[in-house]
């Protein structure tokens, strides 16, 4: 064990290298806030939603692949924003990323869409044909009995 490792200086050097690779202290704090981890890896590819997929085999197997969602999503990310081909790569179902080896396309497969029920303005609300049984009282109005 070297003196550098014993004093922990190698950890400080590794952290400094990560800060440099990520793009500065501000970028590290932003990534730490969004992902709860400060990871550095090679960009494997991106999809049509703007997600960026990374891999670093220095981490152990379930955590060596990850996705970074675009800034427009911020903290409102959802698992449905990851297309199926990238999902299979993230979960080690396939070894090759879709950017390297695209999966075969079928005529009957629809294009992937994210779940829109998380957005209030795009949420599906069925039309109701029944009257409400309970009506809220508004001050200053006479009650209406049918």
Swiss-Prot record:
Keywords of this entry: Electron transport, Membrane, Mitochondrion, Mitochondrion inner membrane, Respiratory chain, Transport
Compartments where located: Mitochondrion inner membrane
GO-annotated cellular components: mitochondrial inner membrane; mitochondrion; respiratory chain complex I
InterPro entries recorded: NDUFA12
Name of one Pfam family that matches: NDUFA12
Keyword Iron included in the entry's annotation: no
Main location: mitochondrion
Family: Belongs to the complex I NDUFA12 subunit family.
Assembly information from the UniProt record: Complex I is composed of 45 different subunits.
Role according to the record: Accessory subunit of the mitochondrial membrane respiratory chain NADH dehydrogenase (Complex I), that is believed not to be involved in catalysis. Complex I functions in the transfer of electrons from NADH to the respiratory chain. The immediate electron acceptor for the enzyme is believed to be ubiquinone.
Protein name: Probable NADH dehydrogenase [ubiquinone] 1 alpha subcomplex subunit 12
Organism: Caenorhabditis elegans
């Amino acid at each position: 064990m070297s003196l550098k490792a014993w004093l922990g200086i190698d950890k400080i050097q590794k952290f400094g290298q990560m800060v440099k690779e990520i793009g500065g202290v501000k970028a590290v704090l932003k990534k730490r806030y969004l992902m709860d981890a400060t990871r550095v890896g090679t960009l494997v590819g991106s999809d049509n939603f703007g997600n960026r997929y990374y891999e670093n085999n220095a981490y152990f197997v379930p955590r060596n692949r990850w996705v970074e969602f675009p800034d427009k999503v911020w903290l409102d990310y959802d698992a449905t924003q990851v297309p199926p081909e990238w999902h299979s790569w993230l979960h080690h179902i396939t070894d090759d990323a879709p950017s390297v080896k695209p999966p075969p396309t079928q005529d009957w497969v629809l294009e992937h869409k994210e779940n829109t029920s998380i957005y209030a303005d795009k949420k599906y609300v069925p039309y109701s044909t029944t009257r409400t049984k309970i009506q809220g009282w508004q001050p200053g109005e006479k009650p209406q009995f049918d």
